[in-house]
Amino acid sequence: MTLLEMIQKENAAAFTHGGKFHADDVFSAALLLHFNPKLTIQRGNRVPEEFDGIVFDIGRGEYDHHQKDSRIRENGAPYAAFGLLWEALGTEILSPKMAECFDEKFVQPLDNNDNTGEKNELAGLIGMFNPVWDDNRRSDAAFFEAVTIAGRILEHKWERFRADERMEQQLSLIHISEPTRLQ
């Protein structure tokens, strides 16, 4: 079964780490929910043995980058969970060319932040959704609040990339190449 089929099946479920969250797991969850808003996402410190679903950013599986042999892109940028999921699903949302461009301009900076601590303003803003020490909110509630915002950001960003592609197509009709990107 492909990842997309797993996401879209009835009663689909996903699991990620609990506690403090980062842009990586938040955008990963938002990406999965794009394909199935009814997907149930559970958080915890350990993947339950009986769990039958998509596991990301924990568990040392296909969509977890916390392992010795974690993958690195050809340009040297390390994958985090969001990048691994985007690699599998990006062309379901954008054309191959635009999916690659989106990876380079949007996903890789978030993956770099998660892997190296490199400063990233968006990652910092998402991190601010984590409850402070004296906040009575549960971490899970804050996580899903951040996921909702991340989902809206993704939708708007994808539309910008689609608009760029439409612009390139229109400009190619009048033989202008390489327009200035507005991203």
PLM regions and their residue ranges:
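Long, charge-rich alpha-helical interaction segments
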Residues: 140-145, 149, 153, 157
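Generic structural signal of hydrophobic/aromatic residues within well-ordered alpha-helices
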Residues: 106, 110, 150, 170-171
